[in-house]
Amino acid sequence: KYIQEFKNNLTEIGKPSVTKSKVKPYTKVSFKPDYARLGISGLSEDMLSLFKKRVYDVSAITDKTIKVKLNGQVVPCKNFEQYIDLYVGSKTDTKRVYEQTDPRWEYAVCLAPNDEFQQVSFVNGIYTSKGGKHVEYIMNQIIRKLCVYIKQKKKVDVKPTTIKEQLMLFLRCDIENPSFNSQTKDELGTAVPKFGSSCTVSDGFIEKIAKMGVM
């Protein structure tokens, strides 16, 4: 059992304590904000909500055998599909198409609620709020194949932007040595050839999206 404490912006680093554990392996992270240093009197509801979201993020994108707890309660979100439900409701509430062609790539698409493209994506467990090359990689395949599919079925040429603005993408992927466009790591900058793996969106996935209401 390894325990170590850090204080005052890592200026004070306590000595590690290593003892034999009597329980199953686990990781516990706890912290006490220095309100005076931060210039606040306490944590706002928005801050608490953000912390809660990050805990749910961890639960959704880590191994399914790992139990994640928040304030002593197991988080009821064990996989990426259940995580998607938190955004758009159940599959009955909102139709979506899900696919995992490789352990490194997992994604789902539903119709955008406001006719404006939206994305929720993760790279190696990091939430990329601005998307990036991984989102472009998957979306470009989806849009290109949908244009071809609609052309074949309806004999109509559709602009890529018309399709994109109808969709909402959820994406989780693992990238080798990812690079980001800023220190906030909210946008992936790694070029596609350096991903370390590839992903091909299946034709069946495209057909299901078309039948979902895009076409």
Regions found by a protein language model. Name each.
Residues K1, K145-Y149, M215:
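Charged, low-complexity, helix-prone segments enriched in Lys/Glu/Asp/Gln
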Residues K1-L86:
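GHKL-type ATPase core
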Residues Y2-K22, E45-R54, S121-Y137, Q183-A210:
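Extended active-site and interfacial segments that coordinate phosphate-rich ligands
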Residues K20-F31, I61-T65, A108-Q118, P193-M215:
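Short, compositionally biased low-complexity segments
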Residues V29, P160-M215:
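Extended, well-ordered alpha-helical scaffold/bundle regions in very large, multi-domain proteins
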Residues S49-D186:
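GHKL/Histidine-kinase-like ATPase module
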